[in-house]
Curated annotation (Swiss-Prot):
GO terms for molecular function: glutamate-1-semialdehyde 2,1-aminomutase activity; pyridoxal phosphate binding; transaminase activity. This is Glutamate-1-semialdehyde 2,1-aminomutase. Keywords: Cytoplasm, Isomerase, Porphyrin biosynthesis, Pyridoxal phosphate. The modification N6-(pyridoxal phosphate)lysine is found at K265. PANTHER family: GLUTAMATE-1-SEMIALDEHYDE 2,1-AMINOMUTASE (PTHR43713), GLUTAMATE-1-SEMIALDEHYDE 2,1-AMINOMUTASE 1, CHLOROPLASTIC-RELATED (PTHR43713:SF3). It comes from Burkholderia ambifaria (strain ATCC BAA-244 / DSM 16087 / CCUG 44356 / LMG 19182 / AMMD). Pfam families: Aminotran_3. Homodimer. Its cofactor is pyridoxal 5'-phosphate. InterPro entries: 4pyrrol_synth_GluAld_NH2Trfase, Aminotrans_3, Aminotrans_3_PPA_site, PyrdxlP-dep_Trfase, PyrdxlP-dep_Trfase_major, PyrdxlP-dep_Trfase_small. NCBIfam families: hemL, PRK00062.1. It is found in: Cytoplasm.
Amino acid sequence: MSNNQILFERAQKTIPGGVNSPVRAFRSVGGTPRFVSRAQGPYFWDADGKQYIDYIGSWGPMIVGHVHPEVLSAVQNVLADGFSFGAPTEAEIEIAEEICKLVPSIEQVRMVSSGTEATMSALRLARGFTGRSRIVKFEGCYHGHADSLLVKAGSGLLTFGNPTSAGVPADIAKHTTVLEYNNVAALEEAFGAFGDEIAAVIVEPVAGNMNLVRGTPEFLNALRALCTKHGAVLIFDEVMCGFRVALGGAQQHYGITADLTCLGKVIGGGMPAAAFGGRRDIMAHLAPLGGVYQAGTLSGNPIAVAAGLKTLQLIQAPGFYDALTAQTKRLADGLAAEARAAGVPFAADSIGAMFGLYFAERVPTSFAEVTKSDTERFNRFFHLMLDEGVYFAPSAYEAGFVSSTHDDAVIDATLAAARRAFAALAA
């Protein structure tokens, strides 16, 4: 038995399914999960000492690569001062100022410890601000594992074939209306029917949890206009795409301003940190100023803030996003070219430093189109690439991520491995 197999068997005795987040279990692709022993730059090494090119980057946070020396130094510099205080620090102000500078729609921001906390808190705030209960979300968009959002969601739920979680009471789910992503007509119909009941619309402007699916400009502009017209709060869930698709996130890319924005992943630099923020008049309803309660023991943790602040400083380097976007596009275009040369039906897309791989004739634009992709062929491709030392997401329904450490040599090695994998698929 390999060390990975030994660890997986051991883990299953004390951890449900042997993992602390379902997609890590390899259930949809089969086989044994890779247990990571260490990581550096664009690589990680598993428990058997095998090196992999890493295209999940902890599901998005590692935009400057694993163990970036300046991020490491920033963390080391604060460790001796204390791990957690439960009281305000100057560093919290510094990261808040940085976030507000980079995302102009955010006038005030509140730090939390996870993306789920961010979206859950933003929805509570929107309901408190509007005095309404109904939430609108979209098929395949994943906004964390709060009850009201686990309805026709993406991510691990979609991976396991049941997009609505057990354990979500009908009395909670009834306040969530689910519409088709990128469907403007359905959106207009919903607002026409019950627009005065809608507290908020929450959306991934670039969805990454049903694979990569871009919101169309028409769809996102319609969202903005309808929310404004009906007094609903527009929430952009940029936990994944924030600081990934552009320095100012999807709002910069599309030129659309949200009322509230949820952030995570990159803002923690690999540490557990997230945030939600937006218009000052809405944020004023949060305790201790207003009646909407939200709190957290580890919110604004000094170690996480140090890693996140340094990461946010690094990504502002001139040309950072131009180079990162170009490398990501080179990967996606190169994979599509290799598949085409082998005669394998395949499509790829990228935006900023996110990419999607689809065993389908074209890039999907909705949840329904994503679910028509050839998952069996994806699973074979995943394992062929894994054998080659390339680690893509172990699910056909997750986006991939490129870091600034994925240089030409890394992309070249990936494409060479893909050439062999597609040839094997076509045989």
